[in-house]
């Protein structure tokens, strides 16, 4: 199948990668797995075995008029430990490589169907200036909404020039993730990056 490039030429790509049916369930699984993998999961509380103090009986068993107590570490005490103390946990979800790649193929196919994939021969700016990046995108007709630039290799000028623009992301073909692709209204990708993606997902 052929994809139109902004310079007017056509780029031949694999229909096995860019002509798939949209599998919403699989894409959802990939997005959830990616977001879950980014969770820190560092919450931790002290149990009654870990709080300080409480080594001795606070007062004698009988004769004080107060309720009997053996330790001040118990959960009903103000400085006591937590009953079921939280522990750091791993939120990451396992997703098979085959399923993940199928989800990415599904996303790229849907981007192409919805005319949200803009293929350019190359995308460079002379200096790391926000103005130049915005002008380059405007020249391509990508002016509004959430935009994502994808190149085959890291371009320092593009990176520095784009990071101050609201709703504009920048990735290389090797660092693409399902969330940034799904969220983008327009994905501007270079021919070289598209070929790298095709090779990866073939």
Task: Mark where each language-model region is.
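A short, flexible low-complexity segment enriched in Lys/Arg and Gly/Pro that occurs
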Residues: 26-62
């Amino acid at each position: 199948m052929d994809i139109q490039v902004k310079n007017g030429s056509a780029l031949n790509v694999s229909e096995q990668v860019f002509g798939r049916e949209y599998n919403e369930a699989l894409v959802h699984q990939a997005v959830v797995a990616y977001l879950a993998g980014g969770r820190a999961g560092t919450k931790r509380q002290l149990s009654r075995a870990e709080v300080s103090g409480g080594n001795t009986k606070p007062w004698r068993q009988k004769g004080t008029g107060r309720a009997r107590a053996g330790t001040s570490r118990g959960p009903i005490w103000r400085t006591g430990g937590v009953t079921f103390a939280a522990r750091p946990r791993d939120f990451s979800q396992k997703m098979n490589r085959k399923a993940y790649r199928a989800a990415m193929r599904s996303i790229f196919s849907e981007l192409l169907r919805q005319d949200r994939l803009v293929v350019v021969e190359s995308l460079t700016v002379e200096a790391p200036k926000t103005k130049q990046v915005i002008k380059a995108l405007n020249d391509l007709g990508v002016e509004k909404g959430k935009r994502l630039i994808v190149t085959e290799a890291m371009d320092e000028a593009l990176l520095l020039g784009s990071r101050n623009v609201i709703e504009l992301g920048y990735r290389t073909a090797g660092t693409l993730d399902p969330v940034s692709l799904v969220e983008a209204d327009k994905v501007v990708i270079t021919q070289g990056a598209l070929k790298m993606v095709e090779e990866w997902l073939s």
